[in-house]
């Protein structure tokens, strides 16, 4: 039997679609069948008329929830109105 890591204290208000307020990729946060949380980023290039998807594992440590892009960690934090979510290096997001 496989053992899955269950994360306690995940901010469930983060689940769902988020729009970037400053042109960074829009994101969708979801829980997979394996019980883990993921962030799906979508970026649309108007010049080439193509979209690009990237999926990141969400992990937690003593500093909070984060995604890893290569060697870089981007921390996710709740933000007060009118936005709701802040991702380090990507900026603020509003719930779609």
Residue spans for each PLM region:
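Intrinsically disordered, low-complexity segments enriched in glycine/proline and serine/threonine
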Residues: 16, 49-50, 75
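Generic ordered-secondary-structure signal
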Residues: 16, 22, 45-46, 67
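N-terminal glycine/threonine-rich, aromatic-flanked beta-hairpin/loop signature
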Residues: 24-62
